[in-house]
């Protein structure tokens, strides 16, 4: 199982939100690329980077900060937030991103995502409130169940699905294993758990399930609840 340290970008700074509320943003670093170097030193292989401003605006906002992060280490980077057309996919891959996350567009234009997955390394991001897909930086909730959307990409060739339980995100209340397994089983695609990881026991529960391909760790690290060096030793 892979562990993805998370860097969420708002106005070029690394922040964490609670339940996706931009007003709750807490700044953890004014130089996100330095965080990337720290994670690399701990033994990370991947980074999970989100342009929060981009997710809400529907367009790329923190491109320069993302480029600095990518150029500062040898880590593989998956990037999401406001990527809704082929030009933006190519732009991120051209600066060295390893794969791109398509979120809102997966609900609104699933055929576009399938086409892109044939050409580029694409990850689908599915964010859910009470089991239903949320889009536009989590500001809107649809009538489609997350598992139903996941099933649409079972044979699309996407590299992974990231599933986030919004109610858990940034709350340090424990990961939603049942939801993660529901997505993994509905899609048959490598599934990455996101939202609510509180400590090492959560990571081990996901690993021990044998059905989860990865986990994203954000606030639990920034608030000192998880020793990432130890986590990488135990899991990778």
Swiss-Prot record:
Gene Ontology MF terms in the entry: 1-(5-phosphoribosyl)-5-[(5-phosphoribosylamino)methylideneamino]imidazole-4-carboxamide isomerase activity
SUPFAM superfamilies linked: Ribulose-phoshate binding barrel (SSF51366)
BP GO annotations: L-histidine biosynthetic process; L-tryptophan biosynthetic process
Family: Belongs to the HisA/HisF family.
UniProt pathway annotation: Amino-acid biosynthesis; L-histidine biosynthesis; L-histidine from 5-phospho-alpha-D-ribose 1-diphosphate: step 4/9
Top enzyme class: isomerase
EC number(s) given by UniProt: 5.3.1.16
Main subcellular localisation: cytoplasm
Residues of the active site: 8, 127
GO CC, alphabetical: cytoplasm
Reaction(s) this enzyme catalyzes, per UniProt: 1-(5-phospho-beta-D-ribosyl)-5-[(5-phospho-beta-D-ribosylamino)methylideneamino]imidazole-4-carboxamide = 5-[(5-phospho-1-deoxy-D-ribulos-1-ylimino)methylamino]-1-(5-phospho-beta-D-ribosyl)imidazole-4-carboxamide
Protein location: Cytoplasm
InterPro entries on file: Aldolase_TIM, His_biosynth, HisA_bact_arch, Isoase_HisA-like, Isoase_HisA-like_bact, RibuloseP-bd_barrel
Protein name: 1-(5-phosphoribosyl)-5-[(5-phosphoribosylamino)methylideneamino] imidazole-4-carboxamide isomerase
Domain of life of the organism encoding this protein: Bacteria
Keywords associated with the record: Amino-acid biosynthesis, Cytoplasm, Histidine biosynthesis, Isomerase
Pfam families: His_biosynth
